């Protein structure tokens, strides 16, 4: 299964394409979409949307895994990230790409074995699990790969739940 992991943001959207086959996962492509600071917020969202659409069309993932919004103390930041998530989900919907969403706690649990693992531990585990020579940078890229690895772990269970519920 080809999974496009996404870490939403307004300045940087991390992404990583992970292949999960026969219990093995490997990173195929990872990078980020950047939007210029100070640019009109609507232009930034348009840049994110266009970038995600281009990735979906070029990489042909089978599914997208997106980190859910974690509300912090800065509501302005949370709102902006929520808008970025919206255009990311819209790009997936326009291309018919299925989307799975995971909380930061679920991602950390799947990757590091502990839902409250520090960011550094999650990054080291992403590096180890995907056999990367270096930790992916910036952090947003490592987070996107972590979301994809999380989905690779959860996808079989989610499919089984659907099958059981459909009976």
Swiss-Prot record:
Keywords: Cytoplasm, DNA damage, DNA recombination, DNA repair, DNA-binding, Endonuclease, Hydrolase, Magnesium, Metal-binding, Nuclease
GO biological process: DNA recombination; DNA repair
Binding residues annotated for Mg(2+) 2, in chain numbering: 67
InterPro entries tied to this protein: RNaseH-like_sf (IPR012337), RNaseH_sf (IPR036397), X-over_junc_endoDNase_Mg_BS (IPR020563), X-over_junc_endoDNase_RuvC (IPR002176)
Cofactor detail note: Binds 2 Mg(2+) ion per subunit.
Kinase is among the record's keywords: no
PROSITE patterns from the UniProt entry: RUVC (PS01321)
Reactions the enzyme catalyzes: Endonucleolytic cleavage at a junction such as a reciprocal single-stranded crossover between two homologous DNA duplexes (Holliday junction)
Gene Ontology molecular functions: crossover junction DNA endonuclease activity; DNA binding; magnesium ion binding
Residues that coordinate or bind Mg(2+) 1: 7, 140
CDD domains in UniProt: RuvC
Localisation: Cytoplasm
GO cellular component: cytoplasm; Holliday junction resolvase complex
Cofactor(s) needed: Mg(2+)
Superkingdom as given in the UniProt entry: Bacteria
This protein's record includes keyword DNA-binding: yes
Alphabetized Gene3D superfamilies for the sequence: Ribonuclease H-like superfamily/Ribonuclease H
E.C. no: 3.1.21.10
Active site (UniProt): 7, 67, 140
Task performed by this protein: The RuvA-RuvB-RuvC complex processes Holliday junction (HJ) DNA during genetic recombination and DNA repair. Endonuclease that resolves HJ intermediates. Cleaves cruciform DNA by making single-stranded nicks across the HJ at symmetrical positions within the homologous arms, yielding a 5'-phosphate and a 3'-hydroxyl group; requires a central core of homology in the junction. The consensus cleavage sequence is 5'-(A/T)TT(C/G)-3'. Cleavage occurs on the 3'-side of the TT dinucleotide at the point of strand exchange.
Similarity comment: family membership: Belongs to the RuvC family.
Quaternary structure, from the entry: Homodimer which binds Holliday junction (HJ) DNA. The HJ becomes 2-fold symmetrical on binding to RuvC with unstacked arms; it has a different conformation from HJ DNA in complex with RuvA. In the full resolvosome a probable DNA-RuvA(4)-RuvB(12)-RuvC(2) complex forms which resolves the HJ.
Protein name, per record: Crossover junction endodeoxyribonuclease RuvC
UniProt organism field: Moorella thermoacetica (strain ATCC 39073 / JCM 9320)
Gene: ruvC
């Amino acid at each position: 299964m080809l999974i496009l992991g996404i870490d939403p943001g307004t300045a940087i959207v991390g992404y990583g394409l992970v292949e999960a086959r026969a219990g093995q996962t490997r990173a195929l492509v990872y990078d980020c979409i950047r939007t210029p600071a100070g640019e009109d917020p609507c232009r930034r969202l348009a840049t994110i949307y266009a970038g995600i659409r281009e990735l979906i069309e070029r990489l042909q993932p089978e599914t997208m895994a997106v980190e859910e919004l974690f509300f912090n103390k800065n509501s302005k930041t949370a709102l902006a990230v929520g808008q970025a998530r919206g255009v990311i989900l819209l790009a997936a919907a326009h291309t018919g790409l299925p989307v799975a969403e995971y909380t930061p706690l679920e991602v950390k649990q799947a990757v590091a074995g502990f839902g409250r693992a520090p960011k550094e531990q999650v990054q080291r585990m992403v590096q180890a699990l995907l056999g990367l020579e270096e930790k992916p940078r910036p952090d947003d890229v490592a987070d996107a790969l972590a979301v994809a690895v999380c989905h690779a772990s959860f996808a079989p269970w989610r499919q089984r739940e659907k099958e059981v519920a459909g009976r």
